[in-house]
Amino acid sequence: MLGRNSLGLILFIIALFYNCSTKKDVLYVQDVSDKELYNVSYDEYKIQLDDVLKISILSKDPETTLEFNPSASNVTNSKEILLYNGYQVNQNGNINFSSIGEINVEGLTIIQAVELVRKIIVENKILIDPIVDIKLLNTHFIILGEVNRPGKYDFFKNNLNILEAIGMAGDLTINGERKKIKVLRNKISSDKSRFKKIFSVDLTSSDFINSDAFQILSGDIIIVNPNSSRIKNAGIIGNSGTLLSLLSFVLSSIIVISN
């Protein structure tokens, strides 16, 4: 005969196992020992549409140099300063650079863009030996889903990795699927056609350190889907309350029949 105390214990155990995630579901990088070392390589960022570039020119002729280095002394808003000082890459992949005109920079690395701008200035005999510096002003990523602070985040370091990006968003929630994080990235092919590439990242395995998605690039979108426990709890069929109510009814019926 099944007593009432036994019934309560059964229901408690079922609820405990149904709702709890295992360590394998939530721990990061589970296959790494303290002695293991990893060589991490970072790819150079390639300029995309809508990027804002700050281009600084230095030379022995300061008067001619002034036209390439506008001053934002009358602008107080930080976003306005960003746009005022920068050259935005238009839908054709070009920037309209001062008196020189349009320069196609889409798909170039920052170093390649520096070399191109310097070459054009010298070939047009504007400056003899200019020093060119280019910085990307609007580096950002977007993170959505099961993180504590989803949203758009600006960053200003050259090599940002996915763990740092997740940390900026307050870490994953306990309901985040750590084995199938998606990273959407803008890409440009050799024929200049544009597309998005989707990476899948498993944070429970050290393999992701060698993934192309380990490095987060400007414009990346990170999507953290809910894990199976979260989906079950949110559903109707898999809802734990529904399941326990049904089980309670069945067990209660057994007790009544047994008595």
Where are these regions (language model features)?
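Sec-dependent bacterial lipoprotein signal peptides
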Residues: M1-C20
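Ser/Thr/Pro/Gly-biased, low-complexity, turn-/loop-rich segments
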Residues: L2, C20-N259
